[in-house]
C-alpha cells in the first residue's frame, strides 16, 4: 500500500531507450511486491492469471508482462531479470524470454546503497524473430554501458557452443522438456554436458537480503 498509485518522476535509462525506438507504451503491468517472488500475486491487484489456464500462475516477477503478451493484448513487453524474472514467466506462458548480457541494454538507475546492479533489462515476446528484432533496434540507442553490436540475426550462428544442462530438483515433466531441448541442440552440433550444481539454502537467504535492500 505504501507505493500504491506511486508514479515515477522520471524515465529510467532503459525506458528512454524503448521510447527512442518508437514503441508505444500502453501502461504498467503487474508484478509481485518489489519483484521478490517467482509468482505474480500482488496484494493490491490480486493474483495475475495465466492466459492458457486461469488456475495457473504466469510466473514472476514479470508475470503481468508475460500474461499480456501470451493473451495477445500486446506483442512485446518490458521485463527484467535478476534471478529468473524474464525466464520464469516466459517458461510458464510459452513465450520467448531472453536474459541479455548485462550492458547489452541500458542499466537502470539502481539503489545508491548497493554496490552492484544485478538486473538485466529485456523483453518477453511470442517469437525468436520478435526478440531478435527488438535487440537489433535497441542496441543502436545511446547506452554508456553498450557492448559491441550484434546486428540483425537472420540465421543460426556457425559457432558450436558448450552447454551445461542442470535439472537438479526439477519436476519430471520440466526435466524431460529440458532434456528434449538439449537433444535438439546436440543434433545441431552443440556439446551438451549434464552437470549438478549443489545449492545451499543460505544462498537464497543472502539473495533476499540483497534484493530487499535494492527495493529501497
What residue ranges belong to the model's regions?
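A short helix-breaking turn/cap at a secondary-structure junction
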Residues: 99-180, 199
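N-terminal, positively charged, Ser/Thr/Ala/Gly-biased leader segments
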Residues: 1-6
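General small-molecule cofactor/ligand-binding pocket signal
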Residues: 26, 191-196
Amino acid at each position: 500500500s505504501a507505493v500504491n498509485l506511486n508514479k515515477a518522476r522520471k524515465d529510467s535509462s532503459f525506458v528512454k531507450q524503448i521510447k527512442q525506438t518508437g514503441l508505444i507504451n500502453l501502461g504498467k503491468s503487474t508484478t509481485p511486491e518489489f519483484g521478490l517472488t517467482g509468482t505474480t500475486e500482488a496484494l493490491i491487484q490480486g493474483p495475475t492469471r495465466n492466459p492458457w489456464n486461469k488456475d495457473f500462475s504466469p510466473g514472476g516477477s514479470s508475470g503481468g508482462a508475460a500474461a499480456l503478451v501470451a493473451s495477445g493484448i500486446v506483442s512485446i513487453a518490458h521485463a527484467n531479470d535478476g534471478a529468473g524474472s524474464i525466464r520464469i514467466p516466459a517458461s510458464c506462458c510459452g513465450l520467448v524470454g531472453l536474459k541479455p548480457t548485462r550492458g547489452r541494454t541500458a542499466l537502470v538507475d539502481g539503489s545508491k546503497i548497493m554496490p552492484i546492479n544485478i538486473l538485466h533489462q529485456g523483453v518477453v515476446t511470442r517469437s525468436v524473430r520478435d526478440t531478435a528484432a527488438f535487440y537489433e533496434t535497441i542496441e543502436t540507442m545511446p547506452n554508456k554501458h553498450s557492448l559491441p553490436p550484434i546486428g540483425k540475426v537472420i540465421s543460426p550462428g556457425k559457432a558450436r557452443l558448450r552447454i551445461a544442462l542442470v535439472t537438479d530438483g526439477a519436476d519430471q515433466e520440466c526435466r524431460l522438456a529440458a532434456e528434449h531441448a538439449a537433444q535438439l541442440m546436440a543434433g545441431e552440433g552443440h556439446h551438451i554436458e549434464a552437470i549438478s550444481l549443489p545449492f545451499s539454502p543460505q544462498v537464497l537467504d543472502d539473495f533476499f537480503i540483497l534484493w530487499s535492500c535494492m527495493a529501497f
